Amino acid sequence: MVLSASLARPAKPKSQRKAAPKPMAAMRKRKKETTRQRQRRRAMELRAAREAKQVRPEMLIVPEDNLTVQELADMLSVESSEIIKSLFFKGIIATVTQTLDMNTIETVAEEFGVPVLQDDVEEAAKKTVEMIEEADKEHLIRRPPVVTVMGHVDHGKTSLLDAIRKARVAAGEAGGITQHIGAYQVEIDHNDEARKLTFLDTPGHEAFTAMRARGTKVTDVAVLVVAADDGVRPQTLEAISHARAAEVPIVVAINKIDKEGASPDRVKQELSEQNLLAEDWGGDVVMVPVSAIKGENIDKLLEMLLLVTEVEDLQANPDRLARGTVIEAHLDKAKGPVATLLVQNGTLKTGDVVAAGPVLGKVRAMVDDNRQRLKEAGPSFAVEALGFSEVPTAGDEFEVYPDEKSARAVVGDRASDARATRLAQQMASRRVSLTAMSGQANEGELKELNLILKADVQGSVEAILGSLEQLPKDEVQVRVLLSAPGEVTETDVDLAAASGAVIVGFNTSMASGAKKAADATGVDVRDYDVIYKLLEDIQLAMEGLLEPELVEEALGEAEVRAVFTIGKSAVAGCYVTTGKLQRNCKVRVHRGSQVVYDGDLDSLRRNKDDVKEVATGFECGVGTDRFANWEDGDRIEAFKMVTQRRKLTT
């Protein structure tokens, strides 16, 4: 009893006791709202609170690493289930944690009436002024201007650079197209002082839009080359838009003034329509008529470039670790990964530890555009560097770190981000449109052309992929299983053999053993050095997958001049006026403006003999099993149905 008393809870005083709830009243209160009703009420309250709190944005700004389904739903102020439902009807099975690519985000956002802007679009177009830090300002010196040469294909950009460098390098380029960006530095006399200019040569073909955009990212002035005998062309307009997006001054080089039909004034007039008004017409745009072939006015053009960039106050700090941009990169069979680097701040030295995007490197050797080995390269200097662990991506910024440990830490984070981006891209490449499939269900299975793409440099890979995106995809899909710079390897051949793919190489070679493997497995390997031919052949291959179509092929015409009744049937006596008539061909019988018969020609006779055909200028008798109502003056149109290769339609 003592133990029991010690453990018992003491009774509360009466003043502190609570009144016991009435059990029946509580039961009646619970019965008023069921579980389902309570859940529905809470959902409505949450939805109302969300709608009151969040307003759908006027514009959706997407970060560079894209968005998950849940993040997109939050930014659009909608339920994630709405996004998943929208994706399902587009043939994409997604979860709330799945990362969406940019194209998918744009499509979904447009359904909800919200336009999309990628966060890095504006940033990528502008010069990388962030290369200069606050600590650099006490050590700044003048640096050489970086000049981008832009314009329409075949307007003479490479020839102009050739004239500037006094070296004949332009003649050997396939199809007149510069296949990847080159960087060159020249030294000129300006006011009795040696001054330098660094030139970036961006390819002129419209397929290389991405490379031109990278060129303007690092440039201080754009030289717009326009042929005096051709005028403003589509790529000219594109180059103007890139230069304006980069907010860099434009100097126009009106090239080929030596050619017959050259009209610099016509070029100025066409450019004025694009709000580029020449100085001698009262505007502020420097326009210099030049002849790259004859070397006319090249010195004047260089002078103008220096004058235009003097007001820009271009500076950099050479006494710091280097920073800059990867202009181009490729895999060399003997040297390994090779990158063309433009130093924008600091000084790059042999032995420096470099991080370029997710790629780590230690500079083993550097050469300039004349293949001279260098120990260091200062601001605005372009070099070809060896020593990267893998091929960096053209357009990535690079930075030198004091030691390998700190560089590895940065590269590791970037590599994780790059892997996530690749996974998102792979998910996008596997998408199949349910709408497209249902629309083609009656015409057979969806056709695909599998490709493996290898090219000399990353810039070429991007350009070709961009061009493939422009091909019609309504009936045949192009699926790129692998795209990378470098030579064609046995692994590529194995992948092609397993997937039924064609290997397309652009300015690249085959590794040892790859050709033998391709021959043994029957894999088709195509190599090209001109992008036009590559795209043309791929389009022909896509058309080869289409079912041929039946089309009419005209044979001839005849005129009915007499009608002979034989029992229940009739025979028309005809005169062949053009072409020929063939037995068992198709005919249309025209009577005035009407077609009274459209079908087979069953009998064809000449002088009571059955014949296979009757040529122009001869008489014959014709008959059909399904038509006997012939009349004098009827016109017979003869034709046959033939199969024809179909063309892709946009």
UniProtKB/Swiss-Prot annotation:
Q: What is the lineage of its organism?
A: Bacteria, Bacillati, Cyanobacteriota, Cyanophyceae, Synechococcales
Q: Where is the tr-type G domain?
A: 142-314
Q: Where is the composition biased (Basic residues)?
A: 11-20, 27-40
The protein's UniProt keywords, in alphabetical order, are: Cytoplasm, GTP-binding, Initiation factor, Nucleotide-binding, Protein biosynthesis
Q: What does this protein do?
A: One of the essential components for the initiation of protein synthesis. Protects formylmethionyl-tRNA from spontaneous hydrolysis and promotes its binding to the 30S ribosomal subunits. Also involved in the hydrolysis of GTP during the formation of the 70S ribosomal complex.
- Give the region (Disordered) as residue ranges: 1-40
Q: Where does GTP bind?
A: 151-158, 201-205, 255-258
Q: Where is this region: G4?
A: 255-258
Domain of life (superkingdom): Bacteria
Q: Which GO terms describe its molecular function?
A: GTP binding; GTPase activity; translation initiation factor activity
Question: What is the similarity comment for this entry?
Answer: Belongs to the TRAFAC class translation factor GTPase superfamily. Classic translation factor GTPase family. IF-2 subfamily.
> Which compartments is it annotated to reside in?
Cytoplasm
Please provide, in alphabetical order, the Gene Ontology terms of the cellular component aspect for this entry.
Answer: cytosol
Principal localization? cytoplasm
Q: Where is this region: G5?
A: 291-293
Checking Gene3D superfamilies in the record gives:
P-loop containing nucleotide triphosphate hydrolases (3.40.50.300), Translation factors (2.40.30.10), Translation initiation factor IF- 2, domain 3 (3.40.50.10050)
The record's listing under InterPro entries reads: EF-G-like_DII, IF2_II, IF2_N, P-loop_NTPase, Small_GTP-bd, T_Tr_GTP-bd_dom, TF_IF2_bacterial-like, TIF_IF2
- Name one matching Pfam family: EF-G_D2
Question: What's the name of its gene?
Answer: infB
SUPFAM superfamilies noted in UniProt: Initiation factor IF2/eIF5b, domain 3, P-loop containing nucleoside triphosphate hydrolases, Translation proteins
Specify the protein name: Translation initiation factor IF-2
